[in-house]
Amino acid sequence: MAGDALPALPDGQRAAVLWLAGQVGSACWAAFAESPFHRDGLPDPMDRWSKSIGDALARQFGGVALFPSDGPPDHPFQDWGRRCEPLQASPLMLQIHPEFGLWHAYRFALVSPLLEPGDLSALAAPVVPDAEICSRCDGQPCLRACPVQAFTGDAYRVEACAAHLHQPQGQECIGKGCQARRACPVGVDYRYGPEHAAFHMRAFAGKH
């Protein structure tokens, strides 16, 4: 993206454009679940799977792949996302999409030399959402659904969430996914499947 600090490309080519690659719902889950990364027992299997794909594409197109797990310092994926899609902040500290709700994620970005500088003006313009999603939501059920009130609307109480997951009463969240996230009425058709949701919840609990 124009004006962003992007890494140098192979052979001294100019970094012209940044492509974001991600998932909607559980569209990528089957491919990941069947990969050796999911079964090898090593840490961070989804990050390693994403890196294998991103790095392969970077080699194919002569670009450089960037990942959310590269930091610190972290790449500004959320800022990039808001410039590419009509995303908005939500009370759950996640970006909400008007169609997909909270059920989307960026797996990597590809810095590419494929476009000429004159083609960048349209890509650099921020995407403006049509209307506020969460402020128009009746009652904001996401803020009431968490059993330990980990979300205040202004902050995420990580310690309270993690402690709950390590208790017997937290097993519903482990098995079905975050109750606050599932309470959001936007994008319900894209909710993560049970195995996908449990994978992320176990990964979170394992690091806290």
Please state what every model-predicted region is.
Residues L42-H208:
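Catalytic cores of enzyme domains
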Residues M1-D55:
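Non-catalytic, usually N-terminal nucleic-acid engagement modules in DNA/RNA processing proteins
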